[in-house]
């Protein structure tokens, strides 16, 4: 299951993302965050990635937002 989810994100990175200008507010891009979260937390990583995408908007804080060791939908405070 992990490989399928990661393949979907890689498809996005290769074919969809290049069409749009870079807009991620974080140092680890949202798509790379999603891949690493899936690798670390399985399907819960998808939820973490979606929560991260919802946090990525022009009015959010920028900077590092590393993947937490434990499942959480909140921004990792260690990254600030």
UniProtKB/Swiss-Prot annotation:
Q: List the disulfide bonds.
A: none
Disordered as annotated region, ranges: 61-80
Q: Which UniProt keywords apply?
A: Cell membrane, Membrane
Q: Where is the composition biased (Basic and acidic residues)?
A: 62-80
User: Which branch of life, at top level?
Assistant: Bacteria
Q: Which GO terms describe its cellular component?
A: plasma membrane
Membrane topology type, per the record? Answer: Peripheral membrane protein
Subcellular localization(s) per the UniProt record: Cell membrane
| Pfam families (UniProt xref) | YidD
Q: What is its main location?
A: membrane
Described purpose of this protein according to its UniProt entry: Could be involved in insertion of integral membrane proteins into the membrane.
Q: Which family does it belong to?
A: Belongs to the UPF0161 family.
Name of the protein described by the UniProt record: Putative membrane protein insertion efficiency factor
Organism of origin: Streptococcus pneumoniae (strain CGSP14)
